[in-house]
């Protein structure tokens, strides 16, 4: 995965949220607070299911 944006589904509440692929901070679900992405120094570790890649318009 490159450093694009991804729509990720929360494994707990099924909320769909857009996450940056190279997130430098932990990203939590806006609804329930479950961690969706963890920084790894490069590509973020996406913990939810990636629904789609968000393309530039």
UniProtKB/Swiss-Prot annotation:
PROSITE patterns, A to Z: RIBOSOMAL_S27E
Keywords: Metal-binding, Ribonucleoprotein, Ribosomal protein, Zinc, Zinc-finger
Signal peptide start and end residues: none
Necessary cofactors: Zn(2+)
Domain of life of the source: Archaea
Zinc finger regions, C4-type: 10-32
Positions annotated to bind Zn(2+): 10, 13, 29, 32
InterPro entries noted in UniProt: Ribosomal_eS27, Ribosomal_eS27_Zn-bd_dom_sf, Ribosomal_zn-bd
Cofactor note: Binds 1 zinc ion per subunit.
GO MF term list: structural constituent of ribosome; zinc ion binding
GO BP: translation
Alphabetized HAMAP family for the sequence: Ribosomal_eS27 (MF_00371)
Subunit structure: Part of the 30S ribosomal subunit.
Family (UniProt): Belongs to the eukaryotic ribosomal protein eS27 family.
NCBIfam families hit by this protein: PRK00415.1
Protein name (Swiss-Prot/TrEMBL): Small ribosomal subunit protein eS27
Organism: Halobacterium salinarum (strain ATCC 700922 / JCM 11081 / NRC-1) (Halobacterium halobium)
